[in-house]
């Protein structure tokens, strides 16, 4: 007889937003940000109920197609135990379709919440490596997912063997002098829509340029933040995406003219700025506010947290 999770178990997870690429580190570098979603699960005898508060309420599906639900089912299959029924409550603060890793956070949060359930019933929770692998299988690349799992800054990579892709990541010790800012516009953009703007092939010169900058960025993030301007230069994806988000592209250039190491956050249209100054230049703040950007001082986000029982916010 197949074992199932008993009814009445409650678990929760809190997961951070993330910024991928950071300029040159396309699909490999990521940074968790101090903006969080919370997921609360409860097992029931049957059925599925999905409740969404905050970002996405009234817009995302409230059935088995919901990304968090799909991640939960993926995690339960990986552990090897089903649930006969679920109540899934999502409290979302991470903006959708802005380049802040909301989909990766949804997947990582759903998988982590599974750990809170199965740990109460005698099953071994998913490890960090399993969380990275399972969540990256949804995304197709591990940069956002790994940042959401591990917290802080990460370098991630893929090893392929035939049709299989193995996803891995290591965490970097972010230099304490680095200050983070997000600039989030009201407009939205989808990663799929902007990826079609990227060429299938790039020149050796462009590849060499980005390789050097991505390598330098690891040093800048951990040891030499004075190198952030040079280390965040990119020729592989940000110039190509500029036409799809002209306001973000213009603001990006303005920030960089003021010696702020700004990049697109993921596929945009949000921007992330890394600087050793505790404040952005007044001209940059004024321009952002006048052009529909919400500017927020951030810190590096924490690793995903899960626990059995009541919600973190209770």
From Swiss-Prot:
It is an enzyme of class 2 (transferase). It comes from the Bacteria. One of its GO terms (molecular function) is homoserine kinase activity. Keywords: Amino-acid biosynthesis, ATP-binding, Cytoplasm, Kinase, Nucleotide-binding, Threonine biosynthesis, Transferase. It is found in: Cytoplasm. GO terms for biological process: threonine biosynthetic process. This is Homoserine kinase. The gene is thrB.
């Amino acid at each position: 007889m197949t074992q199932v999770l008993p009814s009445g178990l409650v678990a929760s997870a809190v997961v951070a937003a993330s910024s991928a690429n950071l300029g040159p580190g396309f699909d490999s570098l990521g940074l968790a940000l101090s903006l969080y979603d919370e997921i609360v699960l409860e097992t029931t005898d049957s059925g599925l109920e999905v409740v969404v508060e905050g970002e996405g309420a009234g817009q995302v599906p409230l059935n088995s197609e919901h990304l968090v639900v799909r991640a939960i089912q993926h995690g339960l299959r990986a552990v090897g135990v089903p649930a006969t029924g679920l109540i899934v409550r999502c409290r979302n603060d991470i903006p959708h379709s802005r380049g802040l890793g909301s989909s990766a956070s949804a997947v990582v949060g759903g998988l982590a919440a599974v750990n809170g359930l199965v740990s109460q019933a005698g099953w071994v929770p998913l490890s960090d490596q399993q969380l990275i692998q399972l969540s990256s299988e949804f995304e197709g690349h591990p940069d956002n997912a790994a940042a959401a799992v591990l917290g802080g800054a990460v370098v991630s990579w893929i090893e392929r063997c035939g049709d299989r892709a193995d996803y891995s990541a290591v965490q970097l010790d972010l230099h304490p002098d680095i200050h983070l800012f997000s600039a989030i516009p009201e407009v939205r953009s989808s990663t799929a829509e902007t990826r079609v703007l990227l060429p299938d092939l790039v020149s050796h010169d462009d590849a060499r340029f980005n390789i050097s900058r991505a390598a330098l960025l690891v040093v800048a993030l951990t040891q030499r933040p004075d190198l952030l301007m040079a280390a965040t230069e990119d020729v592989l994806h940000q110039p190509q995406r500029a036409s799809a988000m002209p306001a973000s592209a213009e603001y990006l250039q303005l920030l960089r003219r003021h010696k702020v190491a700004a990049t697109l956050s993921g596929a945009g249209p949000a921007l992330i700025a890394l600087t050793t100054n505790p404040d952005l230049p007044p001209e940059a703040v004024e321009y952002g506010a006048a052009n529909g950007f919400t500017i927020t001082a951030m810190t590096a986000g924490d690793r995903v947290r899960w626990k059995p029982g009541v919600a973190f916010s209770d």
